[in-house]
A protein has these predicted regions:
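M16 family metallopeptidases and their MPP-like homologs
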Residues: 1-31, 52-56, 64-65, 122-152, ...
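Proteolytic maturation boundary segments
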Residues: 24-132, 267, 272-274, 285-286, ...
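Short, conserved charged micro-motifs
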Residues: 196-197, 306-310, 365-366, 425-430, ...
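Active-site glycine-rich loop that binds ribose-phosphate moieties when present
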Residues: 278-283
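A surface/extracellular/periplasmic glyco- and lipid-processing/surface-interacting theme
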Residues: 374
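Structured mid-domain segments that build the active-site/substrate or prosthetic-cofactor binding neighborhood
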Residues: 380
Length: 548
Protein backbone atom coordinates (compact mmCIF):
# COMPACT_ATOMS: atom_id res chain seq x y z
CA UNK A 1 0.00 0.00 0.00
CA UNK A 2 2.79 2.42 0.93
CA UNK A 3 5.22 3.85 -1.62
CA UNK A 4 7.86 4.37 1.07
CA UNK A 5 7.44 0.75 2.20
CA UNK A 6 8.03 -0.42 -1.38
CA UNK A 7 11.19 1.67 -1.57
CA UNK A 8 12.35 0.13 1.72
CA UNK A 9 11.74 -3.37 0.32
CA UNK A 10 13.92 -2.62 -2.70
CA UNK A 11 16.58 -1.08 -0.45
CA UNK A 12 16.73 -4.05 1.93
CA UNK A 13 16.73 -6.55 -0.94
CA UNK A 14 19.67 -4.77 -2.54
CA UNK A 15 21.58 -4.22 0.72
CA UNK A 16 21.25 -7.83 1.89
CA UNK A 17 21.46 -9.42 -1.57
CA UNK A 18 18.05 -11.04 -1.21
CA UNK A 19 15.25 -11.66 -3.68
CA UNK A 20 12.57 -9.00 -3.92
CA UNK A 21 9.99 -11.77 -4.34
CA UNK A 22 10.81 -13.02 -0.82
CA UNK A 23 9.59 -9.70 0.58
CA UNK A 24 6.59 -9.50 -1.73
CA UNK A 25 5.47 -13.02 -0.80
CA UNK A 26 6.13 -12.53 2.91
CA UNK A 27 2.39 -12.62 3.65
CA UNK A 28 2.09 -16.15 2.24
CA UNK A 29 5.18 -17.26 4.16
CA UNK A 30 3.71 -15.96 7.42
CA UNK A 31 0.40 -17.73 6.78
CA UNK A 32 2.29 -20.99 6.23
CA UNK A 33 3.84 -20.91 9.73
CA UNK A 34 2.43 -23.70 11.90
CA UNK A 35 1.70 -23.83 15.61
CA UNK A 36 4.39 -26.49 15.99
CA UNK A 37 7.02 -24.19 14.47
CA UNK A 38 6.11 -21.38 16.87
CA UNK A 39 6.28 -23.79 19.82
CA UNK A 40 9.71 -25.04 18.70
CA UNK A 41 11.10 -21.50 18.51
CA UNK A 42 9.63 -20.63 21.91
CA UNK A 43 11.15 -23.76 23.45
CA UNK A 44 14.55 -23.01 21.95
CA UNK A 45 14.84 -19.36 22.91
CA UNK A 46 12.42 -18.76 25.80
CA UNK A 47 12.74 -21.84 28.00
CA UNK A 48 15.26 -22.35 30.80
CA UNK A 49 16.99 -19.78 32.98
CA UNK A 50 18.15 -16.43 31.63
CA UNK A 51 20.11 -13.54 33.04
CA UNK A 52 19.80 -9.88 32.16
CA UNK A 53 22.90 -7.74 32.49
CA UNK A 54 22.66 -3.96 32.46
CA UNK A 55 25.69 -1.69 32.41
CA UNK A 56 25.46 2.02 33.08
CA UNK A 57 28.25 4.34 31.98
CA UNK A 58 27.53 6.92 34.62
CA UNK A 59 28.36 10.56 34.06
CA UNK A 60 32.10 11.16 33.71
CA UNK A 61 33.38 14.64 34.44
CA UNK A 62 33.38 16.75 31.31
CA UNK A 63 35.78 19.48 30.38
CA UNK A 64 34.22 22.80 29.45
CA UNK A 65 36.15 24.25 26.54
CA UNK A 66 36.57 27.97 26.10
CA UNK A 67 34.91 29.59 23.09
CA UNK A 68 37.41 29.62 20.21
CA UNK A 69 37.94 32.88 18.36
CA UNK A 70 36.60 31.96 14.93
CA UNK A 71 36.07 34.59 12.29
CA UNK A 72 32.84 34.18 10.30
CA UNK A 73 33.26 32.49 6.95
CA UNK A 74 31.82 34.24 3.94
CA UNK A 75 31.16 31.62 1.26
CA UNK A 76 30.83 32.88 -2.32
CA UNK A 77 27.35 33.89 -3.44
CA UNK A 78 25.82 33.23 -6.83
CA UNK A 79 28.53 30.74 -7.80
CA UNK A 80 27.69 27.24 -9.03
CA UNK A 81 29.95 24.22 -8.52
CA UNK A 82 31.01 21.96 -11.36
CA UNK A 83 29.13 19.14 -9.65
CA UNK A 84 25.92 21.16 -9.73
CA UNK A 85 26.40 22.06 -13.38
CA UNK A 86 26.94 18.43 -14.38
CA UNK A 87 24.08 17.22 -12.19
CA UNK A 88 21.67 19.54 -14.00
CA UNK A 89 22.76 18.08 -17.34
CA UNK A 90 21.46 14.62 -16.42
CA UNK A 91 18.38 14.01 -18.60
CA UNK A 92 15.09 13.64 -16.77
CA UNK A 93 11.75 12.24 -17.83
CA UNK A 94 8.85 14.67 -17.49
CA UNK A 95 6.46 13.62 -14.75
CA UNK A 96 2.72 13.90 -15.28
CA UNK A 97 1.28 16.01 -12.50
CA UNK A 98 -1.54 14.30 -10.64
CA UNK A 99 -3.64 15.72 -7.85
CA UNK A 100 -5.66 14.46 -4.93
CA UNK A 101 -9.35 14.05 -5.65
CA UNK A 102 -11.68 14.88 -2.77
CA UNK A 103 -14.31 12.73 -4.51
CA UNK A 104 -12.26 9.63 -3.56
CA UNK A 105 -13.84 9.94 -0.11
CA UNK A 106 -17.61 9.73 0.34
CA UNK A 107 -19.11 11.51 3.33
CA UNK A 108 -22.44 10.47 4.83
CA UNK A 109 -24.25 11.75 7.92
CA UNK A 110 -25.51 8.59 9.66
CA UNK A 111 -27.10 10.19 12.72
CA UNK A 112 -26.89 13.58 14.42
CA UNK A 113 -23.20 14.10 15.34
CA UNK A 114 -22.21 10.79 13.70
CA UNK A 115 -20.52 11.13 10.31
CA UNK A 116 -19.06 8.42 8.07
CA UNK A 117 -16.05 9.04 5.80
CA UNK A 118 -15.75 6.13 3.37
CA UNK A 119 -12.72 5.33 1.19
CA UNK A 120 -12.72 2.27 -1.12
CA UNK A 121 -9.88 -0.20 -0.51
CA UNK A 122 -8.41 -1.07 -3.90
CA UNK A 123 -5.50 -3.13 -2.57
CA UNK A 124 -6.62 -6.02 -0.34
CA UNK A 125 -9.26 -7.44 2.00
CA UNK A 126 -8.05 -5.72 5.17
CA UNK A 127 -10.28 -2.92 6.43
CA UNK A 128 -9.17 -0.05 8.64
CA UNK A 129 -11.46 1.94 10.90
CA UNK A 130 -10.73 4.98 13.05
CA UNK A 131 -13.35 6.30 15.44
CA UNK A 132 -12.53 9.92 16.21
CA UNK A 133 -14.58 11.13 19.17
CA UNK A 134 -14.80 14.89 19.67
CA UNK A 135 -13.35 15.11 23.16
CA UNK A 136 -9.83 14.85 24.52
CA UNK A 137 -7.71 15.46 27.58
CA UNK A 138 -8.42 19.20 27.58
CA UNK A 139 -12.02 18.57 28.63
CA UNK A 140 -11.51 15.12 30.21
CA UNK A 141 -7.99 14.99 31.74
CA UNK A 142 -8.42 11.44 33.04
CA UNK A 143 -8.54 10.18 29.45
CA UNK A 144 -4.74 10.35 29.49
CA UNK A 145 -4.67 7.53 32.02
CA UNK A 146 -7.77 5.66 30.85
CA UNK A 147 -6.35 5.30 27.33
CA UNK A 148 -3.09 3.83 28.65
CA UNK A 149 -5.06 1.14 30.44
CA UNK A 150 -7.44 0.43 27.57
CA UNK A 151 -4.55 -0.73 25.40
CA UNK A 152 -3.97 -3.58 27.88
CA UNK A 153 -7.48 -4.00 29.30
CA UNK A 154 -9.47 -7.19 29.62
CA UNK A 155 -13.25 -7.40 29.38
CA UNK A 156 -16.01 -7.81 31.93
CA UNK A 157 -17.01 -9.86 33.74
CA UNK A 158 -13.74 -11.77 34.12
CA UNK A 159 -11.93 -12.00 30.76
CA UNK A 160 -8.26 -11.12 31.09
CA UNK A 161 -6.27 -9.00 28.63
CA UNK A 162 -4.47 -11.96 27.05
CA UNK A 163 -7.77 -13.66 26.26
CA UNK A 164 -9.14 -10.45 24.73
CA UNK A 165 -6.10 -10.15 22.48
CA UNK A 166 -6.56 -13.76 21.43
CA UNK A 167 -10.21 -13.08 20.54
CA UNK A 168 -9.15 -10.19 18.31
CA UNK A 169 -6.39 -12.30 16.79
CA UNK A 170 -8.78 -15.13 15.94
CA UNK A 171 -10.80 -12.62 13.91
CA UNK A 172 -7.65 -11.34 12.18
CA UNK A 173 -7.98 -7.99 13.93
CA UNK A 174 -5.89 -5.55 15.94
CA UNK A 175 -6.81 -2.43 17.90
CA UNK A 176 -5.30 0.57 19.66
CA UNK A 177 -6.50 3.54 21.67
CA UNK A 178 -5.10 7.06 21.56
CA UNK A 179 -5.87 10.54 22.81
CA UNK A 180 -4.84 14.16 22.23
CA UNK A 181 -5.98 17.46 23.73
CA UNK A 182 -8.88 17.43 21.28
CA UNK A 183 -9.82 13.86 20.34
CA UNK A 184 -10.19 10.30 21.63
CA UNK A 185 -9.31 7.69 19.00
CA UNK A 186 -10.13 4.01 18.62
CA UNK A 187 -8.27 2.43 15.70
CA UNK A 188 -9.19 -1.03 14.40
CA UNK A 189 -8.03 -3.07 11.43
CA UNK A 190 -8.78 -6.62 10.39
CA UNK A 191 -10.17 -9.03 7.85
CA UNK A 192 -13.24 -7.42 6.35
CA UNK A 193 -15.21 -10.66 6.22
CA UNK A 194 -15.26 -10.52 10.05
CA UNK A 195 -16.27 -6.85 10.30
CA UNK A 196 -19.54 -7.39 12.17
CA UNK A 197 -17.97 -9.73 14.73
CA UNK A 198 -15.00 -7.41 15.23
CA UNK A 199 -17.27 -4.41 15.85
CA UNK A 200 -19.31 -6.37 18.38
CA UNK A 201 -16.10 -7.30 20.20
CA UNK A 202 -14.84 -3.70 20.13
CA UNK A 203 -18.10 -2.38 21.58
CA UNK A 204 -18.08 -4.90 24.44
CA UNK A 205 -14.42 -4.17 25.08
CA UNK A 206 -14.92 -0.38 25.18
CA UNK A 207 -18.14 -0.26 27.17
CA UNK A 208 -17.27 -3.07 29.60
CA UNK A 209 -13.48 -3.00 30.07
CA UNK A 210 -11.89 -5.05 32.82
CA UNK A 211 -9.14 -2.78 34.10
CA UNK A 212 -6.33 -4.28 36.15
CA UNK A 213 -5.82 -2.73 39.61
CA UNK A 214 -2.14 -3.63 39.55
CA UNK A 215 -1.69 -1.79 36.26
CA UNK A 216 -3.57 1.22 37.64
CA UNK A 217 -1.28 1.32 40.65
CA UNK A 218 1.81 0.87 38.48
CA UNK A 219 0.69 3.66 36.14
CA UNK A 220 -0.06 6.08 38.98
CA UNK A 221 3.20 5.24 40.75
CA UNK A 222 5.06 5.91 37.51
CA UNK A 223 3.30 9.27 37.16
CA UNK A 224 4.19 10.12 40.77
CA UNK A 225 7.89 9.40 40.36
CA UNK A 226 7.95 11.12 36.98
CA UNK A 227 6.62 14.32 38.53
CA UNK A 228 8.91 13.91 41.53
CA UNK A 229 11.98 13.83 39.29
CA UNK A 230 10.95 16.21 36.49
CA UNK A 231 12.60 19.27 38.06
CA UNK A 232 15.91 17.38 37.98
CA UNK A 233 15.70 16.46 34.29
CA UNK A 234 17.24 19.22 32.12
CA UNK A 235 15.29 18.20 29.00
CA UNK A 236 11.97 18.25 30.88
CA UNK A 237 12.80 21.58 32.53
CA UNK A 238 13.66 23.10 29.14
CA UNK A 239 10.38 21.81 27.70
CA UNK A 240 8.44 23.21 30.67
CA UNK A 241 10.19 26.58 30.34
CA UNK A 242 9.19 26.84 26.69
CA UNK A 243 5.60 25.79 27.51
CA UNK A 244 5.48 28.46 30.20
CA UNK A 245 6.77 31.14 27.82
CA UNK A 246 4.23 30.18 25.15
CA UNK A 247 1.19 29.33 27.26
CA UNK A 248 1.71 30.69 30.78
CA UNK A 249 -0.69 29.02 33.21
CA UNK A 250 -2.08 26.94 30.31
CA UNK A 251 1.20 24.99 30.15
CA UNK A 252 0.72 21.23 30.20
CA UNK A 253 3.11 21.11 33.16
CA UNK A 254 0.86 23.45 35.16
CA UNK A 255 -2.68 22.82 33.92
CA UNK A 256 -2.90 19.12 34.79
CA UNK A 257 -4.52 16.82 37.30
CA UNK A 258 -2.89 17.52 40.69
CA UNK A 259 -0.97 14.56 42.07
CA UNK A 260 -3.07 14.54 45.23
CA UNK A 261 -6.09 13.75 43.04
CA UNK A 262 -4.28 10.69 41.68
CA UNK A 263 -2.43 9.35 44.68
CA UNK A 264 -1.57 10.05 48.28
CA UNK A 265 0.05 8.22 51.14
CA UNK A 266 0.41 8.42 54.88
CA UNK A 267 2.71 6.80 57.41
CA UNK A 268 1.18 4.84 60.28
CA UNK A 269 2.66 5.09 63.81
CA UNK A 270 4.44 1.78 63.28
CA UNK A 271 6.13 3.15 60.15
CA UNK A 272 3.89 1.37 57.67
CA UNK A 273 3.24 3.35 54.49
CA UNK A 274 -0.45 3.48 53.63
CA UNK A 275 -1.08 4.20 49.94
CA UNK A 276 -4.36 5.42 48.46
CA UNK A 277 -4.88 5.32 44.68
CA UNK A 278 -7.59 7.80 43.73
CA UNK A 279 -7.79 6.60 40.14
CA UNK A 280 -9.73 3.36 40.06
CA UNK A 281 -11.63 0.99 37.79
CA UNK A 282 -14.90 2.81 38.28
CA UNK A 283 -13.90 6.37 37.43
CA UNK A 284 -11.61 5.35 34.56
CA UNK A 285 -14.29 3.11 33.01
CA UNK A 286 -16.79 5.95 33.37
CA UNK A 287 -14.34 8.29 31.63
CA UNK A 288 -14.11 6.01 28.59
CA UNK A 289 -17.88 5.55 28.46
CA UNK A 290 -18.46 9.31 28.65
CA UNK A 291 -15.91 9.93 25.88
CA UNK A 292 -17.82 7.63 23.52
CA UNK A 293 -20.87 9.83 24.03
CA UNK A 294 -19.37 12.75 22.08
CA UNK A 295 -19.74 13.49 18.36
CA UNK A 296 -17.81 10.92 16.34
CA UNK A 297 -16.26 10.90 12.88
CA UNK A 298 -15.99 7.39 11.44
CA UNK A 299 -13.12 6.96 8.99
CA UNK A 300 -13.47 3.67 7.13
CA UNK A 301 -11.40 2.12 4.36
CA UNK A 302 -12.53 -1.20 2.94
CA UNK A 303 -14.04 -3.12 0.03
CA UNK A 304 -17.57 -3.43 1.36
CA UNK A 305 -20.26 -1.27 -0.19
CA UNK A 306 -20.81 1.99 1.65
CA UNK A 307 -24.41 1.03 2.45
CA UNK A 308 -23.25 -2.18 4.13
CA UNK A 309 -20.61 -0.24 6.04
CA UNK A 310 -23.15 2.35 7.18
CA UNK A 311 -25.39 -0.44 8.46
CA UNK A 312 -22.49 -2.10 10.29
CA UNK A 313 -21.52 1.16 12.01
CA UNK A 314 -24.66 0.96 14.13
CA UNK A 315 -22.63 -1.49 16.24
CA UNK A 316 -19.85 0.95 17.22
CA UNK A 317 -19.60 2.35 20.77
CA UNK A 318 -21.95 5.34 20.89
CA UNK A 319 -24.97 6.65 22.74
CA UNK A 320 -28.48 7.37 21.53
CA UNK A 321 -27.78 11.11 21.65
CA UNK A 322 -24.21 12.15 20.91
CA UNK A 323 -23.02 15.36 22.61
CA UNK A 324 -21.72 18.27 20.54
CA UNK A 325 -17.96 18.54 20.24
CA UNK A 326 -15.92 21.63 21.14
CA UNK A 327 -12.85 20.27 19.36
CA UNK A 328 -10.35 21.00 18.00
CA UNK A 329 -8.90 22.74 21.04
CA UNK A 330 -6.42 25.52 20.36
CA UNK A 331 -4.69 26.64 23.55
CA UNK A 332 -4.46 30.40 23.92
CA UNK A 333 -0.83 31.50 23.75
CA UNK A 334 0.77 34.29 25.73
CA UNK A 335 1.17 37.66 24.01
CA UNK A 336 3.96 40.14 24.72
CA UNK A 337 3.90 43.80 23.69
CA UNK A 338 7.67 44.23 23.74
CA UNK A 339 10.82 42.15 23.43
CA UNK A 340 11.67 40.38 26.68
CA UNK A 341 14.06 37.76 28.03
CA UNK A 342 13.39 34.77 30.28
CA UNK A 343 16.35 32.97 31.84
CA UNK A 344 16.53 29.76 33.84
CA UNK A 345 19.87 29.00 35.46
CA UNK A 346 21.24 25.46 35.29
CA UNK A 347 24.94 25.17 36.13
CA UNK A 348 25.03 21.50 35.08
CA UNK A 349 24.08 22.13 31.46
CA UNK A 350 26.93 21.65 29.01
CA UNK A 351 24.85 23.03 26.13
CA UNK A 352 22.52 25.98 26.50
CA UNK A 353 19.12 26.11 24.82
CA UNK A 354 17.79 29.35 23.34
CA UNK A 355 14.24 29.80 22.02
CA UNK A 356 12.79 32.75 20.11
CA UNK A 357 9.01 33.26 20.04
CA UNK A 358 6.93 35.72 18.03
CA UNK A 359 3.15 35.58 18.29
CA UNK A 360 1.73 36.13 14.83
CA UNK A 361 -1.46 37.20 13.13
CA UNK A 362 -4.71 35.32 12.44
CA UNK A 363 -4.14 32.54 9.92
CA UNK A 364 -5.77 32.25 6.51
CA UNK A 365 -4.95 29.72 3.77
CA UNK A 366 -4.31 32.62 1.39
CA UNK A 367 -1.00 33.03 3.26
CA UNK A 368 0.13 29.41 2.75
CA UNK A 369 2.41 29.89 -0.26
CA UNK A 370 4.10 33.00 1.14
CA UNK A 371 4.51 31.36 4.55
CA UNK A 372 5.98 28.16 3.09
CA UNK A 373 8.35 30.17 0.92
CA UNK A 374 9.49 32.25 3.91
CA UNK A 375 10.06 29.11 6.01
CA UNK A 376 12.14 27.53 3.26
CA UNK A 377 14.17 30.72 2.78
CA UNK A 378 14.65 31.36 6.49
CA UNK A 379 15.18 27.83 7.79
CA UNK A 380 15.19 25.37 4.90
CA UNK A 381 17.85 22.95 6.09
CA UNK A 382 21.51 23.81 5.57
CA UNK A 383 20.68 26.26 2.78
CA UNK A 384 18.37 28.28 5.04
CA UNK A 385 19.51 31.54 6.61
CA UNK A 386 19.48 30.28 10.19
CA UNK A 387 21.80 27.32 9.71
CA UNK A 388 23.93 29.17 7.20
CA UNK A 389 24.51 32.28 9.31
CA UNK A 390 24.73 30.64 12.74
CA UNK A 391 26.33 27.26 12.14
CA UNK A 392 28.01 27.29 8.75
CA UNK A 393 29.53 30.77 8.92
CA UNK A 394 30.22 31.12 12.62
CA UNK A 395 30.37 27.57 14.07
CA UNK A 396 28.14 28.97 16.78
CA UNK A 397 25.58 26.19 17.20
CA UNK A 398 25.05 22.46 16.94
CA UNK A 399 21.39 22.86 16.04
CA UNK A 400 19.46 25.89 14.85
CA UNK A 401 16.10 26.48 13.17
CA UNK A 402 13.28 28.99 12.97
CA UNK A 403 9.93 28.77 11.20
CA UNK A 404 6.33 29.92 11.29
CA UNK A 405 3.69 27.39 12.39
CA UNK A 406 0.04 27.76 11.42
CA UNK A 407 -2.95 26.53 13.47
CA UNK A 408 -5.18 23.66 12.36
CA UNK A 409 -8.18 25.96 11.95
CA UNK A 410 -8.28 29.41 10.29
CA UNK A 411 -8.67 32.56 12.35
CA UNK A 412 -6.30 31.55 15.14
CA UNK A 413 -2.87 33.16 15.41
CA UNK A 414 0.20 31.76 13.72
CA UNK A 415 3.55 31.97 15.51
CA UNK A 416 7.27 31.82 14.83
CA UNK A 417 9.46 29.59 16.97
CA UNK A 418 13.23 29.62 16.65
CA UNK A 419 15.87 27.57 18.43
CA UNK A 420 19.63 27.56 18.88
CA UNK A 421 21.55 24.93 20.85
CA UNK A 422 25.04 26.12 21.72
CA UNK A 423 27.68 26.38 24.45
CA UNK A 424 26.76 28.72 27.29
CA UNK A 425 29.63 31.10 26.55
CA UNK A 426 28.32 31.57 23.00
CA UNK A 427 24.73 32.34 24.02
CA UNK A 428 24.91 36.15 23.95
CA UNK A 429 26.52 36.21 20.51
CA UNK A 430 24.08 33.60 19.17
CA UNK A 431 21.16 35.71 20.42
CA UNK A 432 22.59 38.75 18.62
CA UNK A 433 22.93 36.88 15.33
CA UNK A 434 19.43 35.35 15.47
CA UNK A 435 17.80 38.65 16.45
CA UNK A 436 19.60 40.37 13.58
CA UNK A 437 18.16 37.76 11.20
CA UNK A 438 14.68 38.46 12.57
CA UNK A 439 14.96 42.24 12.30
CA UNK A 440 17.32 42.69 9.34
CA UNK A 441 16.85 39.62 7.17
CA UNK A 442 19.52 39.54 4.43
CA UNK A 443 18.42 39.37 0.79
CA UNK A 444 19.50 36.44 -1.40
CA UNK A 445 17.03 36.46 -4.32
CA UNK A 446 19.26 34.03 -6.24
CA UNK A 447 17.89 31.24 -4.01
CA UNK A 448 14.39 31.55 -5.48
CA UNK A 449 14.86 28.91 -8.19
CA UNK A 450 15.67 26.22 -5.63
CA UNK A 451 12.87 27.36 -3.31
CA UNK A 452 10.27 27.23 -6.11
CA UNK A 453 11.44 23.77 -7.17
CA UNK A 454 11.27 22.51 -3.59
CA UNK A 455 7.78 23.92 -2.93
CA UNK A 456 6.47 22.67 -6.29
CA UNK A 457 7.68 19.11 -5.69
CA UNK A 458 6.58 19.13 -2.04
CA UNK A 459 3.06 20.20 -3.01
CA UNK A 460 2.75 17.43 -5.61
CA UNK A 461 4.19 14.85 -3.20
CA UNK A 462 1.60 15.61 -0.51
CA UNK A 463 -0.53 12.57 -1.28
CA UNK A 464 -1.94 10.76 1.74
CA UNK A 465 -2.13 6.99 1.68
CA UNK A 466 -5.36 5.15 0.99
CA UNK A 467 -6.12 4.60 4.67
CA UNK A 468 -5.32 8.13 5.87
CA UNK A 469 -6.88 9.93 2.91
CA UNK A 470 -10.23 10.70 4.55
CA UNK A 471 -8.70 12.27 7.66
CA UNK A 472 -6.25 14.39 5.66
CA UNK A 473 -8.92 15.59 3.24
CA UNK A 474 -11.19 16.50 6.15
CA UNK A 475 -8.37 18.51 7.75
CA UNK A 476 -7.75 20.37 4.49
CA UNK A 477 -11.46 21.18 4.30
CA UNK A 478 -11.43 22.50 7.88
CA UNK A 479 -8.66 24.88 6.83
CA UNK A 480 -10.90 26.16 4.02
CA UNK A 481 -9.67 24.23 0.97
CA UNK A 482 -12.32 23.06 -1.48
CA UNK A 483 -9.78 21.17 -3.62
CA UNK A 484 -6.29 19.71 -3.35
CA UNK A 485 -4.01 22.44 -1.90
CA UNK A 486 -1.45 21.56 -4.57
CA UNK A 487 -3.93 22.32 -7.35
CA UNK A 488 -5.01 25.53 -5.62
CA UNK A 489 -1.49 26.80 -4.90
CA UNK A 490 0.69 25.49 -7.72
CA UNK A 491 0.28 28.51 -9.97
CA UNK A 492 1.21 30.85 -7.11
CA UNK A 493 4.24 28.68 -6.31
CA UNK A 494 5.48 28.68 -9.90
CA UNK A 495 5.14 32.46 -10.11
CA UNK A 496 6.86 33.19 -6.81
CA UNK A 497 9.44 35.92 -6.61
CA UNK A 498 11.57 37.22 -3.78
CA UNK A 499 9.24 40.16 -3.18
CA UNK A 500 6.58 37.74 -1.88
CA UNK A 501 8.96 36.46 0.81
CA UNK A 502 10.15 39.98 1.63
CA UNK A 503 6.59 41.27 2.00
CA UNK A 504 5.57 38.35 4.22
CA UNK A 505 8.65 38.92 6.39
CA UNK A 506 8.03 42.66 6.74
CA UNK A 507 4.36 42.18 7.63
CA UNK A 508 4.77 39.31 10.07
CA UNK A 509 8.32 39.10 11.46
CA UNK A 510 10.38 42.29 11.14
CA UNK A 511 10.50 44.40 14.34
CA UNK A 512 7.85 42.29 16.08
CA UNK A 513 8.17 41.73 19.87
CA UNK A 514 10.38 38.70 20.48
CA UNK A 515 10.37 36.58 23.62
CA UNK A 516 13.86 35.16 24.14
CA UNK A 517 13.92 32.07 26.36
CA UNK A 518 17.28 30.82 27.65
CA UNK A 519 18.32 27.92 29.85
CA UNK A 520 22.03 27.61 30.56
CA UNK A 521 24.94 27.96 32.95
CA UNK A 522 24.74 31.39 34.65
CA UNK A 523 28.51 31.41 35.19
CA UNK A 524 29.26 31.45 31.47
CA UNK A 525 26.17 33.01 29.86
CA UNK A 526 26.92 36.71 29.33
CA UNK A 527 23.73 38.10 30.86
CA UNK A 528 25.11 41.65 30.96
CA UNK A 529 25.49 41.72 27.18
CA UNK A 530 21.98 40.34 26.71
CA UNK A 531 20.42 42.78 29.20
CA UNK A 532 22.18 45.76 27.63
CA UNK A 533 20.63 45.02 24.22
CA UNK A 534 17.25 43.46 25.03
CA UNK A 535 16.23 44.87 28.41
CA UNK A 536 15.23 43.34 31.71
CA UNK A 537 15.87 39.62 32.18
CA UNK A 538 13.15 37.72 34.03
CA UNK A 539 14.74 34.89 35.99
CA UNK A 540 12.54 31.82 36.25
CA UNK A 541 12.93 29.00 38.75
CA UNK A 542 11.90 25.38 38.05
CA UNK A 543 9.34 25.63 40.86
CA UNK A 544 7.35 28.16 38.81
CA UNK A 545 7.11 25.81 35.84
CA UNK A 546 5.43 22.84 37.51
CA UNK A 547 2.24 22.35 39.49
CA UNK A 548 0.48 19.30 40.76
Amino acid sequence: ESTSAKVNILTYAFAYNEKVDDYINEDAAIRAITKEQVAAVAKKYLSGDHITLEISEGEPKKNVLAKPQIKPLDPPKGVETEYSKNFKKIPTTPVTETFNNFADVTERQLYPNVKLFYTPNTKNDVFSLTLKYGVGTHKMPKLQYAVQLMNTAGMMPNIDAQTVRRQYSELGASYSFGVTDSYFYISISGEEKNLDKILELVTKHVLMPNLDNRQIQSMVSSAYWSRYSEKRNPSVVASALLEYALYGENSHYIDRIPMDELYNFSVAPDGTVIETFLLNKTNLTTTIQEATGYAVDIHYCGKKDINDVAKAMAKIPMKETMANSESPIIRERATYNKTNVMFLADSKMQQAKIYFYINGKPYDIAQDVACDAFNQYFSGGFSGLVMNEIREKRSMAYTAFGSVSNPIIPGKDSYLLGYVGTQSDKVADAVDVFMDLLNNMPDYPDRMENIITFLHQSALAAKPGMRSKSMVFDQWKQLGYKDDPAKVNLNSIDNLNYDVIKTYYEQNIKNQPVTIVIIGNPKTVNLKQIKAKYGKITKVSPAKLFKG
